Amino acid sequence: MNHPTSTGGTAFNPPRPATMIYLCADCGARNTIQAKEVIRCRECGHRVMYKMRTKRMVQFEAR
């Protein structure tokens, strides 16, 4: 039995939850935190986290 195979199909890739990198304010450890996850350092348990800055250039035009 020879079945034809389809090559034009598209695969559905569900969007991954956004993962952000944060720095702990107490110990300085890097933590990856996903959406709906508790904001707490995995090393020391501190709850104050700083979001990492972007690497790309951010420029604003003043008027």
UniProtKB/Swiss-Prot annotation:
Binding site for Zn(2+): C24, C27, C41, C44
GO MF assignments: DNA binding; DNA-directed RNA polymerase activity; zinc ion binding
GO terms (BP aspect): transcription by RNA polymerase I; transcription by RNA polymerase II; transcription by RNA polymerase III; transcription elongation by RNA polymerase I
Gene3D superfamilies, per the entry: RNA polymerase ii, chain L (2.20.28.30)
Gene that produces this protein: rpc10
Disulphide bridges: none
Record function comment: DNA-dependent RNA polymerase catalyzes the transcription of DNA into RNA using the four ribonucleoside triphosphates as substrates. Common component of RNA polymerases I, II and III which synthesize ribosomal RNA precursors, mRNA precursors and many functional non-coding RNAs, and a small RNAs, such as 5S rRNA and tRNAs, respectively.
Source species, domain of life: Eukaryota
SUPFAM superfamilies from the UniProt entry: RNA polymerase subunits
Annotated GO CC locations: cytosol; nucleolus; nucleus; RNA polymerase I complex; RNA polymerase II, core complex; RNA polymerase III complex
UniProt name for this protein: DNA-directed RNA polymerases I, II, and III subunit RPABC4
InterPro entries, per database record: RNAP_P/RPABC4 (IPR006591), RPABC4 (IPR039747), RPABC4/Spt4 (IPR029040)
Subunit structure: Component of the RNA polymerase I (Pol I), RNA polymerase II (Pol II) and RNA polymerase III (Pol III) complexes consisting of 14, 12 and 17 subunits, respectively.
Keyword Nucleus among UniProt keywords: yes
Family that this chain belongs to: Belongs to the archaeal Rpo12/eukaryotic RPC10 RNA polymerase subunit family.
